[in-house]
Amino acid sequence: MGGCFSKPKPVELKIEVVLPEKERGKEELSASGKGSPRAYQGNGTARHFHTEERLSTPHPYPSPQDCVEAAVCHVKDLENGQMREVELGWGKVLLVKDNGEFHALGHKCPHYGAPLVKGVLSRGRVRCPWHGACFNISTGDLEDFPGLDSLHKFQVKIEKEKVYVRASKQALQLQRRTKVMAKCISPSAGYSSSTNVLIVGAGAAGLVCAETLRQEGFSDRIVLCTLDRHLPYDRPKLSKSLDTQPEQLALRPKEFFRAYGIEVLTEAQVVTVDVRTKKVVFKDGFKLEYSKLLLAPGSSPKTLSCKGKEVENVFTIRTPEDANRVVRLARGRNVVVVGAGFLGMEVAAYLTEKAHSVSVVELEETPFRRFLGERVGRALMKMFENNRVKFYMQTEVSELRGQEGKLKEVVLKSSKVVRADVCVVGIGAVPATGFLRQSGIGLDSRGFIPVNKMMQTNVPGVFAAGDAVTFPLAWRNNRKVNIPHWQMAHAQGRVAAQNMLAQEAEMSTVPYLWTAMFGKSLRYAGYGEGFDDVIIQGDLEELKFVAFYTKGDEVIAVASMNYDPIVSKVAEVLASGRAIRKREVELFVLHSKTGDMSWLTGKGS
């Protein structure tokens, strides 16, 4: 493992450095008269990209034969605040009527393909019903996360009381749009030991920071470094779909980074940061100067410290290779999952159809108790038991026993011995900030990096985002919190980038997360730590419910299964700054207005 541009180490050094395709100019042409952008390989030498490797850019104004136009409805067919999916021959379009105006957009969320017509329309944007991403209905732009791409916006005209939509056939089929981005024009890119922006960590926060800089017109050098051997990938899928291959998880193809001049250093470990000289040092000794620094190192999974911890086939899930190996070894074997949090339960659910047996060991009385409460936790536990998962609650692992070096049994403190060929440990994580201890960058007692609303650390020019930070949560009276959610990391990465450019942006996102188990999705919005009551509407046994988490007189979080789009609705209300009172929820449940959420907007029913 090593840093960037270092001397060759044939076995250990693996670097993925992707450089920009420079603007064509006379001084940049090769002897053949063709532009010759270069990329550094693992040994520090340069190679030329061939013409066929270049990205093709579609013409921004499609010819008439590439477009389709049709009348999709009468002007009176939609009321203000309504949405409808309409067919346009080559694909569907989301038609929206808001404040008397019609808007036509892509109909699927670019994140995971949710039908936006089932989402929430509010304040000039539509919020995805599945994961909470928000899109501006006037532009199609992504305004809140998760996800990277925006929606296509189509032309609308009114003639003789009919609504016509015109769209390119290609846009109808793609259903996603990458924002216009700058390219790197820095003459030193790839040749210098300095960079304008260095991003440590290539998860959601790091990638969104880099993309936001380019979207805002930043054309200087950006270096993104990661401990992973892969380009940025969809990490939440690791525990939900363990046999997904790395190339299927990629958030952007290699050509994307090349096109927009975002250099990616893989398997590059930062060991020290010197804020006085603005230099970072990599494990192989290479030093890189920066002007602005984003720290997004993420977290490291906790491991077991019991007797026998060195036996083989005991895993944490941190990389695609970890996940792939677990599912390969688990087929037809006995699996023990330690920890009944989101990661552990997702892994257990996924392996039930592949393993001979799946057992879960947990210190609490019920899964998710601290996060979702006793009643919801028990309902989910029953769902797992109905799918042949065995639980060992209120105990922990005291010993891992092996045979010929490989795991054979898990011994619990309750004295129970559980057969196990594979053990997956999901007992939480700690911030991966050890390399910052002597840097002068502030860390709290748990190792998290405290930041302000603008994602700034205590050191000027140094920002932090993602799982390793604590930040003030605006709608919870700026309470300092750590929220290791995929969606939150996206938002923090964008705010950090905006403030690198002195835009004075602040974090205002409402946390939104989701999990999937046995084909059922649970959605959650808000920040429920410290809740003192849970109000449930629906049927827990049927797993069709919404749970409101309250503290005092205020709703601070909501969770649901088979009750869409109520979580997105609540998230939108909280994002607007309006508090939801406990009494409102109690009346909602009392009158059993199942599915009716008009009370949230104050419109009545």
Curated annotation (Swiss-Prot):
What gene codes for this chain? AIFM3
Assigned protein family:
Belongs to the FAD-dependent oxidoreductase family.
Annotated function: Induces apoptosis through a caspase dependent pathway. Reduces mitochondrial membrane potential.
The entry's protein name is Apoptosis-inducing factor 3
Location in the cell reads:
Mitochondrion
Which GO terms fall under biological process for this protein? execution phase of apoptosis
Gene3D superfamilies found in the cross-reference section: 3.30.390.30, FAD/NAD(P)-binding domain, Rieske [2Fe-2S] iron-sulphur domain
Q: Which GO terms describe its cellular component?
A: cytoplasm; cytosol; endoplasmic reticulum; mitochondrial inner membrane; mitochondrion
Q: Which InterPro entries match?
A: FAD-oxidoreductase/Apoptosis, FAD/NAD-bd_sf, FAD/NAD-binding_dom, FAD/NAD-linked_Rdtase_dimer_sf, Reductase_C, Rieske_2Fe-2S, Rieske_2Fe-2S_sf
Task: Please list the residues that bind [2Fe-2S] cluster.
Answer: 109, 111, 128, 131
Regarding domains, what does the record say?
The Rieske domain induces apoptosis.
Sorted alphabetically, the keyword list is: 2Fe-2S, Apoptosis, Electron transport, FAD, Flavoprotein, Iron, Iron-sulfur, Metal-binding, Mitochondrion, Oxidoreductase, Transport
**Could you tell me which residues belong to the region Disordered?**
22-45
- Residues annotated to bind FAD: 201-205, 235, 240, 270, 467, 514
Give the matching SUPFAM superfamilies: FAD/NAD(P)-binding domain, FAD/NAD-linked reductases, dimerisation (C-terminal) domain, ISP domain
PANTHER family registered for this protein in UniProt: APOPTOSIS-INDUCING FACTOR 1, APOPTOSIS-INDUCING FACTOR 3
What is the reported tissue distribution? Ubiquitous. Expressed in bone marrow, cerebral cortex, liver, ovary, thymus, thyroid gland and tongue (at protein level).
Q: Which residues form the Rieske domain?
A: 70-165
Q: What class of enzyme is it?
A: oxidoreductase
